[in-house]
Amino acid sequence: EVQQLVADQIIDFFKTNPNYTVASIGQNDGNGDPASEDYANWCECDDCKKFATDFTQAMMKFAKIIGQKIEKQCPGKSIMFYGYFPTFTAPDTTALKAEDNVVMMLCKEGGLTRFIRNGNLFNAAIGQPQFKDNYQAWKDLGYQIYEWNCPGAASDKWKDMFWIQGEVFLDNLKWLKQNGTQYLCMDQGPNPAYERADGYMDIRWPLWYVSAKGMWDCNLSFEDILMPACKRFKAV
């Protein structure tokens, strides 16, 4: 019943919004911690436990079912779920190949100073895999991969820190493009939970500027992007 309700809503959404090509059916930040405000994203009743062995496979199976249900009525449209926290690690199975109309938004966090191609551990302390290996494992399951990228830390300790993710960010963009990423979403505030409420442009414009220009052309160097902007500021 839930599956059909979601499919019906997705079909209605695309009919109402014909210019949209993707709709999310994914969870938010829920990380499986009972103390998390997002914990309710994951039902753990007996039926749901029978549905899948873990959160990742539950999301994959659910997305596959919804994708099949909307395919005929929504040609050329896709649905998306997140590879994030409990669903970050690709499962060790080939039984859950992706539908053509299912997209996975893989969320890279951590490793803000590291190159993906050199081995960028997401969180070794809790046993998560190398980002690049995990990325390839999702591709091997047939998923179109979008990328959610946070170039700065979601921490109030960073709110007054001048931070530019330069050559690392640009090289990581190249790696993602070379490995088939179709869409990149940049997420970096301003969020009053961990950023300045006012005056954030003074300290964040270089980070955002390099990110934006780099997405237009990731073959530019850090100096190519930022030096002309700094010279214009100096001239003013």
Residue spans for each PLM region:
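Catalytic-core regions of glycoside hydrolase
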Residues: 1-4, 8-227, 232-234
